[in-house]
Amino acid sequence: MQAIELKKGMIFNQDGKLIEVLKSNHHKPGKGNTVMQMDLRDVMSGAVVHKTMRPSEKVDLVNVSLKKAQYLYDDDTDFIFMDTDTYEQYLIPKEHLASEAKFLMPNIEVDLKFTDEGKLIGINLPSTVKMTVKETQPEIKGATAAGGGKPATMDTGLVVTVPDFIKEGEELIIGTENGDYKGRADSITR
């Protein structure tokens, strides 16, 4: 496969390491050839790097299979998930899910990602999650919905910019793509 075909979420093998594509953009500088600018994450270490590749550069795509699972809890070193069909439990080291951790709520359904060899390499989050506002500033009289918003700390520690009318204790829908506010949980039907 060529680098130009890589899309977000795909995993390829580079120098014996599994690399996940976080973002991929075509870029045509004023002079010169088109290049691919990508944000890549080492699946095992969690390290994220920005890399520029030629569109024709060859990559070795890794086949990934998915299994439905439920997030149960975490301990000092791992996140624990349960296969919803077999009830088998899987442990993933916390450092491997650094960016996903802030969206993990007990009982949330995720997809576990496995290589063809059966190696667990990560998770796919749902597109949105329901979270509760743990801490935010009180509503300001006269604030409008068109205002810039205010920071709110969710029950996982994630900080989200929310409209001024949001209060502590409210349940919100949060996008997992970039941690943005989607709406109140009671006003959005999924």
UniProtKB/Swiss-Prot annotation:
Localization per Swiss-Prot or TrEMBL: Cytoplasm
* Name of the protein in question: Elongation factor P 1
A single MF term (Gene Ontology): translation elongation factor activity
GO biological process, alphabetically ordered: peptide biosynthetic process
Q: Which family does it belong to?
A: Belongs to the elongation factor P family.
Species of provenance: Lactobacillus johnsonii (strain CNCM I-12250 / La1 / NCC 533)
Role played:
Involved in peptide bond synthesis. Stimulates efficient translation and peptide-bond synthesis on native or reconstituted 70S ribosomes in vitro. Probably functions indirectly by altering the affinity of the ribosome for aminoacyl-tRNA, thus increasing their reactivity as acceptors for peptidyl transferase.
InterPro entries documented for this protein? Elong-fact-P_C, NA-bd_OB-fold, Rib_uL2_dom2, Transl_elong_fac_P/YeiP, Transl_elong_KOW-like, Transl_elong_P/YeiP_cen, Transl_elong_P/YeiP_CS, Transl_elongation_fac_P
Q: Does the keyword Protein biosynthesis apply?
A: yes
Q: Name one GO cellular component term.
A: cytoplasm
Give me the gene this protein comes from: efp1
Q: Which SUPFAM superfamilies match?
A: Nucleic acid-binding proteins, Translation proteins SH3-like domain
Q: What is its main location?
A: cytoplasm
Matching entries from Pfam families are given as: EFP, EFP_N, Elong-fact-P_C
User: Which pathway does it serve?
Assistant: Protein biosynthesis; polypeptide chain elongation
For this protein, the record's Gene3D superfamilies field holds: 2.30.30.30, Nucleic acid-binding proteins
